[in-house]
Amino acid sequence: MDGTTIVALLYDFDRTLCTQDMQNYAFIPSLGMDPEDFWREANDFGRREHMDGILAYMYTMIRKCREKRVPLTRESLRRCGESIVFFPGVDGWFDRIDRFGTLLGVQVEHYVISSGLREIIDGSAIAGHFKEIYASEFYYDGAGWPVWPKLAVNFTAKTQFVYRINKGVLDVSDDRTLNASMPDDSKRVPFTNMIYLGDGLSDVPCMKMMRAYGGQAIAVYQDANRPGVEQLLRQGRVDYIYPADYSEGAGLELTVKEIIRRMAVNHRLSEEKHAQLRAVQGT
C-alpha cells in the first residue's frame, strides 16, 4: 500500500439510488406488461421450479421477449438505462463526495453491488462514476442474443464483492487471488474504510458484514419501506437510516461526510501507530 487513504462507498441500486426496480422504467413497458404482472410471473416461475430468484427473472426476461418478439440485446438494455429516475440529489452526489474526500486527502471510490442488470446500469446517467459495477449480466451469442447468465448476483452472493473490493481483486473471474491469503496491511481497502448503502432486507448480508468488520451500514427509505428500515435500526443491523435524499446539505450527505472524516483520522492514526511499531522493532 502507498499510504493513500481510500474510502469505498458501496451501493445497492434499485430503491437505493433509483426509485424502483430498474426494469420497471422501460424494459417491462416495452413488453406491454405492468411491472406487477411481470414480477409475479417471474417469481411464480422461480418458486414452481425451485430456482434462484435472480436466475428466474433473467430467464423470464428472455422468454417474454421471445414470446412478444421484442429485441433483447446489450444495446437495447443499455437504452433502458436512459429512462431510470434517480432520487433527489443523486446526479450531483458523487462529485460532491469526491471533492469532500479530496479536501481531506482521501481517495473516495464508488461501487455498485446490485441484483439488477449491469447492462441497464451501464446505460444510466451515473454509470461513469463507479470504479466497478457488480450486477447480474447476460452472456450473448454471435447474433447478440442473451443465451446464458454471465453473472447472477443474489442477496448473499453480494458479500463476495465486498471481499473483492477489500483485497483489490476486482476481476470476477479471478478466484485464485481472491481466495489466497493476504496480510491485512496489504489489503487495498480495509473494511473499516467502507460504507454500504442499501434499502432493505436484501442488503442485510452486506450490512451485517460491514458492522462485523468495522465498516458502516446505512439504509435509505421511501415512505413505503420506512417501517422495515426502522426495524433494521432497532435490530442493530444498520448504523443509520435516512430518507432517500442525496441533496446537498441533507442528513444523508452530512452523515456520510462525517463518517469519511472519521475514517480519514482513524486511518492516519493507524498508519502512525504502525510506523512507530516498525521503528521500535527495527524493521
Where are these regions (language model features)?
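Alpha-helical substrate-recognition element adjacent to the catalytic core
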Residues: 2-142, 238
